[in-house]
Swiss-Prot record:
Phylogenetic classification of the source organism: Bacteria, Bacillati, Bacillota, Bacilli, Bacillales
PANTHER family with a match to the protein in the record: CELL DIVISION PROTEIN DIVIVA
Similarity annotation: Belongs to the DivIVA family.
Mutant lacking the gene: phenotype: Misplacement of the septum during cell division, resulting in the formation of small, circular, anucleate minicells.
An example Gene Ontology CC term for this record: cytoplasm
UniProt protein name: Septum site-determining protein DivIVA
Length: 164
């Protein structure tokens, strides 16, 4: 067990003939006791300071660990968001490409259909024109026919006179 200042103060020595001067020994022990008290007080203060610093180090270590975990969680979340964004972007691009292909195919189909309708209308137009031309020519032939002249020479009064 370590010495205490009281152990030093209360220490008694046996007296012998030609021993140490008692006053000198007591003065020395008193000085040793004071110095020892100072050392013990400083030791206690330093131990308290060490404990306080250990607690602070522990606290900061906990904060550091918490921050590191938070950083890892944030990084993982950022990676998840990035991966999900990339997947979503790929899906959007794929969907846009499908829509573009569909629109192009529909446009091509419509343009082919319109081209076929135009060709059909051209054929119908030629047929109509030919028939119309034939009709007009037939009408012109009727106009050029001498029967018109014969009708003009026909007299209506003569028809009524004959019947009477």
């Amino acid at each position: 067990m370590p010495l205490t200042p009281n152990d030093i103060h209360n220490k008694t020595f046996t007296k012998s003939f030609r021993g140490y001067d008692e006053d000198e020994v007591n003065e020395f022990l008193a000085q040793v006791r004071k110095d020892y008290e100072i050392v013990l007080r400083k030791k206690t203060e330093l131990e308290a300071k060490v404990n306080e610093l250990d607690e602070r180090i522990g606290h900061f270590a906990n904060i550091e660990e918490t921050l590191n975990k938070s950083i890892l969680v944030a990084q993982e979340a950022a990676e998840d968001v990035k991966r999900n964004s990339q997947k979503e972007a790929k899906l959007i691009v794929r969907e846009a490409e499908k829509n573009a292909d569909r629109i192009i195919n529909e446009s091509l189909s419509k343009s082919r259909k319109i081209a076929m309708e135009i060709e059909e209308l051209k054929k119908q137009s030629k047929v109509f024109r030919t028939r119309f031309q034939m009709l007009i020519e037939a009408q012109l032939d009727l106009l050029k026919n001498d029967d018109w002249d014969h009708l003009l020479e026909y007299e209506v009064d003569a028809v009524f006179e004959e019947k009477e």
